[in-house]
Swiss-Prot record:
It comes from Pseudocercospora fijiensis (strain CIRAD86). Binds 2 Zn(2+) ions per subunit. This is Atrochrysone carboxyl ACP thioesterase MYCFIDRAFT_190111. The keyword Hydrolase applies. Pathway: Secondary metabolite biosynthesis. It catalyses: atrochrysone carboxyl-[ACP] + H2O = atrochrysone carboxylate + holo-[ACP] + H(+).
Length: 333
């Protein structure tokens, strides 16, 4: 998660499916009910978590940094947003425990995951050539899908899982059958995505790894990762069914196609606040429609510069019925 306006606690809007202003009050209330996370906590003998000290609207309690391994040499996953309190915690933790960092792995480019890199390099200059990220920036090292990073007691395998961002990587801790899920699966709530179809495919790829535990970049540890991923996929598939059902209702009323605004009204009703409709629901349903279009299940035509969506499945059903009627008439003649 990151912010286009430079607020390290925010989230960079990519498809505007979530809007900080529209959901400010809601998110504040949601955050107030989140469980407390200690600043530093040994989660397992191999995984130490340091909280990013960047709690915010879209970072939940803050971005989790994970220090992985059992010996002196260890690996860091994600670097928070570069808050002074975070780097002080990192420095104190490494010193007190006699830890040396050999690799820094970044799940993706968002500033609340990469912002601490300059401070790490300033304090530990040897890390300059050991910052790893998919689609790397200058002076960073590339990560390949399936690449292995190993230290004493920990073998980490990289897994390309785009959707939240194109460069998004997850990391599998082989010894624990656990996965660092980045922002794809959160400890609480649901992540925003760049591309819904790609995101759903990545969730399935993640599920196929059969990892038991999820270490999310935001929120608490996920004790049953397969159930969490399955629930997320089920929810997204339910949204697809809602959209297709709405288009079917329009067709039943004699309307072949419908605009995005009308589809949102069909699904959620008339009693919608305009900001909620315009800044959240319409962009989200538009993303679902684009995903369904990519699957060949819906299409649109432009009328007066406005996209009007229709179900290709309904079109095929109507065409098939018309063909049957024509065939029956031909036989009768």
């Amino acid at each position: 998660m990151a912010d286009q306006d430079g607020d390290k606690s925010g989230y960079r809007q990519i498809n505007k499916a979530l809007n900080i202003c529209a959901f400010d009050d809601y998110l504040k209330g949601q955050r107030a009910h989140l469980p407390q996370i200690p600043a530093v906590e040994q989660l397992t003998p191999r995984v130490l978590r340091v909280l990013g000290q960047n709690a915010g609207k879209f970072t939940l309690q803050g971005t989790n940094t994970f220090i992985v391994g059992k010996g002196r040499d260890r690996i860091i996953v994600d670097t928070s947003g570069g808050e002074e309190e975070w780097i002080e915690l990192i420095q104190e933790t490494l010193l007190d425990r006699g830890i040396n960092i050999t690799h820094v792995l970044l799940t993706h480019w968002h500033g609340d995951h990469t912002g601490g890199v300059p401070d790490l390099i300033r304090l530990y200059p040897h890390l300059k050539d050991h910052i790893y990220k998919n689609e790397p920036e200058r002076d960073q090292q590339a990560i390949q899908d399936g690449q292995i990073f190993a230290v004493q007691g920990a073998t980490i395998r990289a897994l390309h899982a785009p959707g939240h961002s194109t460069d998004h990587m997850c990391f599998i801790l082989e010894e624990e059958h656990a996965m660092f899920t980045g922002d794809n699966i959160l400890g609480h709530g649901t992540s925003a995505v760049e591309d819904l179809g790609t995101f759903m495919a990545s969730l399935q790829t993640m599920a196929d790894q059969n990892c038991k535990t999820g270490y999310s970049a935001h929120g608490v540890t996920i004790d049953n990762l397969p159930i969490k991923i399955s629930a997320e996929l089920t929810k997204l598939l339910r949204r697809e069914k809602q959209v297709l059902s709405a288009l079917a209702q329009f067709r039943k009323r004699g309307e072949r196609c419908a605009a995005l605004r009308d589809i949102v009204t069909e699904i959620y009703g008339q009693a919608l606040e305009e900001d909620t409709r315009r800044l959240a629901l319409e962009p989200f349903i538009d993303e679902v429609l684009r995903k369904l279009a990519g699957d060949g299940r819906v299409a649109f035509q432009k009328r007066g510069g406005l996209k009007k969506w229709y179900s290709l499945e309904m079109e095929m059903a109507v065409d098939a019925k018309a063909a049957q009627v024509a065939q029956a008439r031909a036989i009768a003649v």
